[in-house]
A protein has these predicted regions:
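Membrane-embedded alpha-helical segments of multi-pass membrane proteins
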Residues: 1-4, 55-63, 107, 114-119
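Hydrophobic alpha-helical transmembrane segments of multi-pass membrane transport proteins
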Residues: 9, 28-46, 92-93, 111-126, ...
């Protein structure tokens, strides 16, 4: 549904969806990385505690920073590495909890969470450092999500099969996940990577667990602990530090 919505938006905006052969191969690889990220996270959440899986996944800013510094000659910065470390610690505090999940395989969960780190880091770097950077953000997001849907469809047919949704309430939930949580977040992610760069985008991505905590407290009446407060403070300091240094430079 998110792909359909973005495609309609692209057509209404006058976007051209034509890709060159070389561009298609790059987009296919990015789609594979994005699909692997989502799939590995699902496996991780099924086998280990959600907080632990999220903490491991949010090591991707560190992976992005290291790749950009050592493979693409991005200027090494102690400020950036310090900010990454602060955001990792903040995410860990926000997601802290038990390791094991009920009826889960801990080893499988840990491996899957680690896979999500590198696949997501590869996707973020790939959007900026390949031919994909020249493709319109809406068009690129449409192709990545569309090809990812095809990959999931094939995977579903070869494993557990597809489950049709019948009731309207579930469709409303799916619609809510498809538009603001998937379509909008993915297209803004691509634009951020192109204009702000992979490293800054990945550090700002640490705001995601912070947002989850805020919604959990004010909407679902979850407890707000000392760990949550410290985690939020560390993430805000990390983001503020990077933005301030970026403006100063």
């Amino acid at each position: 549904m998110a792909t359909i919505a973005l495609t309609l938006f692209g057509w209404c905006s006058g976007c051209s969806f034509r890709l060159e052969k070389k561009d298609f191969l790059v987009v296919l690889l990015l789609s594979l990385l994005r699909a692997v990220t989502s799939f590995s996270l699902l496996i991780a959440y099924q086998n280990i505690a959600t907080g632990v899986a999220s903490t491991i996944h949010f090591m991707y800013p560190l992976a992005v920073s290291l790749v950009m510094m050592y493979f693409f000659q991005e200027k090494k910065s102690l400020w950036v590495m310090f900010a990454v470390s602060m955001s990792l610690l903040g995410a860990a505090l926000l997601s802290s909890g038990e390791l094991e999940a009920k009826n889960g395989d801990t080893i499988v969960g840990l491996v899957a969470a680690c896979v999500s780190v590198f696949s997501y880091a590869g996707y973020i770097v790939g959007v900026r450092m390949t031919r994909a950077v020249r493709i319109n953000s809406t068009v690129l997001t449409c192709y990545v999500m569309g090809l990812g849907t095809v990959l999931y469809f094939i995977g579903a047919l070869t494993t557990s099969g597809l489950q049709l949704v019948a009731d309207g309430y579930t469709w409303l939930i799916i619609l809510g996940l498809a538009l603001p949580a998937t379509a909008i977040s993915n297209i803004t992610l691509v634009r951020a990577i192109k204009y702000a760069g992979p490293t800054l985008t990945s550090i700002l991505g640490a705001m995601e667990p912070l947002t989850a905590v805020v919604i959990g407290v004010f909407v679902f009446k979850e407890l707000f602990t000392l760990n949550s407060a410290i985690g939020i403070l560390l993430i805000l300091l990390a983001v503020g530090m990077v933005v301030f240094r970026k403006q100063k430079s």
